[in-house]
Amino acid sequence: TSRGLGDVYKRQEVTGKSFIEVFRNEYGYLLDYVDGNMMDWSVRPNMIFAVAFDYSPLDRAQKKQVLDIATKELLTPKGLRTLSPKSGGYNPNYVGPQIQRDYAYHQGTAWPWLMGFYMEAYLRIYKMSGLSFIERQLIGLEDELTIHCISSLPELFDGNPPFKGRGAVSFAMNVAEVLRILKLLSKYY
């Protein structure tokens, strides 16, 4: 019924407003998580999903602010960092004993699979004018295809230069995201 759809649209609007009120901060990026009065102000890549997905409560200007911060603080030639160097606890090097590597995993290493969602977000904002930037970003990943495991990408990279590949030598999720982005780019050509 039309009344039922009205309720759905009303809930959608309320949910979107609530999302913005809870997660968007005055610096233009999204809080990583909120649990009651506890808020994580760390700049992390989770916020890029709110820009990349078809349906987002953010308007275009808000999406651009999130993308700009991700570009400045998280983007590397090999993927998005899991934590900004400006945030506390930054540890970009996936080295040492298992416990040390486990700590670094979410504290600044760069994950190639996140680059797919970043690129999708970039194209949502810049459309055709963003294509050359996206192609340049793919070069950083293309170079890796002959280094670790032929035609594959490693699990992650150190978050700082020289962005050394670490973890599993072949990680399907990373390869899948590159293929997904290449398919997305083919729609523009």
Describe each region flagged by the PLM.
Residues 14-111, 139-189:
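Extended glycan-interaction surfaces of carbohydrate-active proteins
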